[in-house]
Regions:
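Alpha-helical subdomain
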Residues: 1-64, 69-70, 167, 172, ...
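Conserved Class I S-adenosyl-L-methionine-dependent methyltransferase catalytic core
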Residues: 12-16, 22-25, 32-33, 53-171
Length: 333
């Protein structure tokens, strides 16, 4: 939204209310409850334990957003909610997406008072979110839910890569930070002679292996539990794929180069900025949020990644853009 009037600005400043109302609906399963049986405010309040009058305002707000419709004094999901919510992702995926958004919100508490902090802006009474390795390592069930969520929402990305990556001469693939193995699975389905190894946190690997078994791919898709920045990694790959990982640098690229066979390739896929100060809005949102935890957080540009690769003795071979907007950079040792 690009506000052009005072009214637009005032509405934008209150948009957190609509966001919180929607997030609560996702976490509490409201749309699925009403899809089973339309209910009035009293019925929803009784089912979810929400005070009736508050529930009435909540339902009216969601209705004003076009997500609910009132049928004979009972609420049901609108046609747009059925398409964009119920038919898009599973209930647990939506619930976890909403939970993650809620857990990030403390970074914005008293932001005007804390934005000058050189490091984290998180309020002193609020713990900052641990990094990925810590989060996935400490909570096995959360890691399982997170892994399955990404498997679901990254299906379109996996299809894009399976349809576009040049896999000529690639028989062994390392999927670095590959989580559920969603991209590897798409590539394995397309290339019968390919075998892949996902490297990720132990709890994520366990959940990913379950998904591989469900897809009857456990013989061709292996999972190697490791912290890829510190632990020893397997070698002998024709390609290392680093997709949506967000960790880059000369030292890491040199490490990955040592894992490749002669003429092996490194392929990096992410939402990089085309140039400094030029980035997609979704990337700007994530970058601003990240900067509230790390004051000097920066968005990598395509040129910066290519420079790091050259410094690590890689030859950049290609650069392309997927329909989703992600940029694909290919390099060879």
């Amino acid at each position: 939204m690009q506000p052009t009037t005072t009214g637009d600005l005032l509405e934008l400043m209150e948009s957190y209310i609509a966001s919180a109302a929607l997030g609560a609906a996702m976490e509490l399963g409201l749309f699925w409850l009403l899809a089973e049986q339309p209910r009035d405010a009293a019925g929803v309040g009784e089912a979810l334990g929400v005070p009736e009058k508050r529930c009435e305002h909540w339902l009216e707000l969601l209705s004003s957003m076009g997500l609910l419709e009132e049928l004979a004094k009972a609420y049901a999901p609108s046609s747009s909610a059925r398409t964009a919510i119920l038919e898009a992702y599973s209930q647990d995926t939506w619930a976890l997406l909403a939970q993650e958004a809620r857990e990030q919100f403390p970074a914005f508490h008293d932001l005007a008072l804390r934005i000058r902090e050189p490091d984290s802006t998180w309020a002193p009474q609020e713990p900052t979110l641990p990094d990925y390795v810590a989060r996935m390592g400490e909570r096995p069930e959360r890691a399982r839910r997170f892994t399955r969520m990404l498997y679901e929402i990254h299906q379109p990305l996996a299809d894009e890569l399976a349809n576009s990556l040049d896999m000529t001469g690639v028989e062994r693939l390392m999927d670095l930070g590959g989580g559920s193995g969603v991209v590897s699975l798409a590539l394995l389905h397309r290339h019968p002679r390919l075998a892949a190894t996902v490297v990720d946190v132990a709890n994520v690997c366990k959940a990913g292996h379950e998904i591989a078994v469900e897809n009857s791919m456990e013989e061709r898709l292996a999972f190697h539990a490791a912290d890829f920045l510190r632990d020893e990694l397997p070698r002998g790959f024709d390609m290392v794929l680093e997709c949506d990982v967000g960790i880059y640098g000369e030292a890491l690229f040199r490490r990955l180069g040592a894992l490749l066979n002669p003429d092996g390739r490194l392929v990096i896929v992410d939402r990089f900025a085309r140039a400094e100060g030029v980035a997609q809005l979704s990337l700007l949102y994530r970058a601003f949020l990240a900067s509230l935890g790390i004051g000097d957080f920066t968005i990598h540009t395509v040129v910066e990644i290519q420079t790091m690769l050259a410094q690590a003795d890689f030859q950049v071979l290609s650069e392309s853009t997927l329909p989703s907007g992600r940029i694909v950079i290919g390099a060879r040792t």
